[in-house]
Structures are given as C-alpha cells and as structure tokens.
C-alpha cells in the first residue's frame, strides 16, 4: 500500500456488543490521523490500547480470544457453586458479579491481582485452600498455555492470508 497510505488495524472483542470491548489498535505511522480516528471510534464501544503491529497476534490471543477464557472461568465458578448447593441461577449471578467486581478492583484501583488476592486470603483459610487446590490442578498454567496456543494459531492463520 505504500508509505503514504495510513492504516490503523484494530482488534476488538465481542464485548463490543455491550460497549465494553478491549480494542487493540496498531498503526503504520507514529502520529497519524488514522490512529486517532480509530481510537475515537473504538473508545465509544469500550477501551482502546495502542500497541505495536508486531504485538497484534499476541493481542488477538489475549484481548479477543481471551474473552472466551474468562467466560469459561465464570462458567466453571458457576458450576462449582452448583456443586456446593447453590441454584444454577444464583450461582451464575454470583460468579458474574464476583468476576465483575474483581475486574473493577484492578481497573479502578490500579492495583496488581496479587495485592487484591492477599487482601482476601488468611492463614489456614478457605480462600488460600481453594487457590492452592486450583494451582495444583494447573489453573494458571492452563490459562497461560491457552493464550500461548491461541497466539501460535493466530500466527499460522495470518501467514495463510
């Protein structure tokens, strides 16, 4: 397309439907109008983050595919609630609001996940017991590996174009 043509590439996610997308935007110019126009458009339907073009595949895996991973975690939490006796309706409502609250603690408070986790864990408590069980079952490793595999697949699909 040449250097005179300014292009902004955007990768939103499906939360765009409720104006809560995380849209990553890359541009072929350092300070171009295409980028500003894209940011203006996508800021209306969520948050935007300017990234380097070479980070777009990783952003696809985390920002676009990642929404499914967080939804799967919410579904699993809801199923756990049902397993311990909650109704399906109440369990899903609790899982959804708890996930939303956790995300807000980080986005509004600007804290790191571990500092928020530390606030709810107590020695010999039920939270640390549950966290340790999840880690022994591979929770973090599975999430990390899923994102890595998605980025690898995105790279293969991109090369086919």
Locate each region found by the language model:
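Internal alpha-helical scaffold of NAD(P)-dependent oxidoreductase catalytic cores
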Residues: 2-6, 22-59, 69-109, 153-157
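Short pre-catalytic strand/loop immediately N-terminal to key active-site residues, enriched for Gly-Thr
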Residues: 8, 56-61, 113-118
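Active-site capping/gating segments
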Residues: 9-24
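A short acidic, helix-capping loop that chelates divalent metal ions and anchors anionic groups
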Residues: 17-21, 58-60, 129
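Thr-Gly-centered strand-to-loop micro-motif
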Residues: 26, 65, 130
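A generic short alpha-helical patch detector that favors 3-5-residue windows
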Residues: 65-69, 93-94, 119-122
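NAD(P)-dependent Rossmann-like dehydrogenase/reductase catalytic/cofactor-binding core
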Residues: 96-161
């Amino acid at each position: 397309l040449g250097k005179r043509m300014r292009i902004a590439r955007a990768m939103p996610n499906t939360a765009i439907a409720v104006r809560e997308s995380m849209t990553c935007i890359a541009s072929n110019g350092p300070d171009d109008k295409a980028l500003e126009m894209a940011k203006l458009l996508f800021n209306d339907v969520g948050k935007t983050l300017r990234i380097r073009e070479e980070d777009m595949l990783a952003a696809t895996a985390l920002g676009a595919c990642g929404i499914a991973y967080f939804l799967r975690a919410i579904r699993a939490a809801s199923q756990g609630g049902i397993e311990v006796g909650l109704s399906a309706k109440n369990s899903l409502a609790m899982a959804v609001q708890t996930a939303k609250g956790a995300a807000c603690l980080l986005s509004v408070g600007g804290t790191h996940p571990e500092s928020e986790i530390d606030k709810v864990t107590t020695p010999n408590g039920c939270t640390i017991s549950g966290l340790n069980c999840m880690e022994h079952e591979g929770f973090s490793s599975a999430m990390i590996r899923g994102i890595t595999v998605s980025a690898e697949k995105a790279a293969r699909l991109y090369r086919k174009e």
